[in-house]
Amino acid sequence: MLVVKKTPKIKGILSAPPSKSYTHRAVICASLANGVSNLKNPLNGADCLSSAHACEMFGAEIDLNDEKWVVRGSEFKTPDNIVDIGNSGTTLRILTGISSQISDGYTVLTGDDSIRKRPMQPLLDALKQLGLNCFSTKNNGTAPIVVKSGKISNNVVEIRGDMSSQFITSLMMTLPFSENDSEIILTTPIKSEPYLNITIDVLDKFGVKIDKIEEKNKVGYKIKGNQKYLPCDYTIEGDYSSASYLVAAGVLLNSDIVIKNVFKDSKQGDREIIEIVKKMGANVEINEDNVQIMGPYKLKGIEIDVTDIPDLVPTIAVLGCFAEGKTVVYNGEHVRLKECDRLAACTTELSKMGAEIEEKKDGLIITGVHKLNGAKLKTYHDHRLVMAFTIAGMMADGETVIEGEDSVKISFPDFVDKMKSIGSNIEVI
C-alpha cells in the first residue's frame, strides 16, 4: 500500500520515464527485422517487458539492459509454449495479428485475470475478414486466443474506429506481410488517433510505410504488400501520459520543478496535458525537451474532449477537483475499456475523498471543491489510477492510503522514488 500525506512543497529536476507506447512498438518491429537493432532509452516496465519476452518466444534474441535493448530479429517461428503476456493489452492485441504470419502451426496467447476480461472480438472479426483463422477458447471474445498461421487472402478489412486503437495498430503491423496491397477501412470516426500516428511513425523508422486514406466516402489506411521490417538504431522519447502526473502536481502544489525528456514536437496525443493546464489557468513553460512549472496556480474548470486522450482522464479528474467551477470530460466511452472502467473508478474513489463528481455515459462532470480529505482508495490494478490518486492525496487533508501501488511498474517503475526526490510526502508500507 501507498500512504500519502499532504505535501507543502515540491522542488527539483526529474525525467519523465520512456514512452510505453513507443517501446512496445519498437521492440516488436525490431524483433520482426532481420538483423540487429539498438533500442535506446526503453521503458523497463512490466508491460513492455511482456512484449520483449513474448518476442523472444517467437525467436527474437534480446539483451535487456536499463539504458539499451539490443534486439536480434528474424522471421517469427511457432512458440514452444503458450505465450503469457501478463497484463499487457497492447502486447496481446499486436501479437494476435502478427502471430498469424508465422510459417506454420498455432499460437496461443493469454494473460492475467484482467487481460482475460479485455475485449478482443473486434480484432478477431477483422482478422477473419482477411481470411485468417483465430478464435477465443471461451467463445466469448476474450483471451485465451488461438491463432492459426495462414496467408492473408482478402486485402480490404473494415473495423470500427471508435473502439480500441490497438486493434487497428495490430492490423497495421500485420498487413505488410500480405502479398498484395491492403486497405483498412474505418466504419466510424477515429478515437485515440494519436496512438495510430505513433504506430505509423515507428513503422516508418523500421522501413514499413503506411498511407492515410481521406476520401469523401472512405477513411482509413493503405498498406503496401511484401514490405520488410528493417533493423535500425532507435531512441525512445519520454512518456507524456506518465509526465501528466508530474504536471498536475506542479500546477496544484507550491512547486519549482523541471520535467525533462518530454519533447515539444512529440506525436503523442497526451502532450495535450500541457494545453489543458494552460487553458485551466496555469503558466507552464514548454521548451524543446523539457517543461518548467512554478506553482501553484488558480485553476478554472473547462470542457475537455478526451476522444484522443483517454489515458489523461484520471489526471484531469484530479485537476478538476481543485478548479473553480465545473470541469466537463466528454467523448470518453472508450475510457471504460482500459485496465478498468476508469470513469466509474474515478467517480467512486474520488468521491470517498469528498470530491463532487458525476459519472456520465461518456465522461465526467467534476465540480471543484478546493479541498479533499484523506481516504482509503482502491485502484483496481490500474497504474494510472495509482498515480493520479497519489497527486490527490498530496493535496488532501489527513492521510490517503492507496491499494495496489505495485501496478505502477507497468509504466512508471520508479514513480514513488521520483516523487519522493522532489519532496512528496509518500511512503510504501
From Swiss-Prot:
Spell out the PANTHER family in the cross-references.
Answer: AROM/DEHYDROQUINATE SYNTHASE, PENTAFUNCTIONAL AROM POLYPEPTIDE
User: Which EC class is this protein assigned?
Assistant: transferase
Q: Could you mention a single GO BP entry for this protein?
A: amino acid biosynthetic process
**GO CC terms of this entry:** cytoplasm
| Organism field | Methanococcus maripaludis (strain C7 / ATCC BAA-1331)
Primary residence: cytoplasm
**Record-level Gene Ontology MF annotations:** 3-phosphoshikimate 1-carboxyvinyltransferase activity
**Primary gene name:** aroA
Location within or outside the cell? Cytoplasm
Family, similarity comment = Belongs to the EPSP synthase family.
SUPFAM superfamilies xref list: EPT/RTPC-like
* The protein's name in its UniProt record: 3-phosphoshikimate 1-carboxyvinyltransferase
Positions binding phosphoenolpyruvate in this chain are 20, 89, 118, 166, 342, 384
Per the record, what are the reactions this protein catalyses? 3-phosphoshikimate + phosphoenolpyruvate = 5-O-(1-carboxyvinyl)-3-phosphoshikimate + phosphate
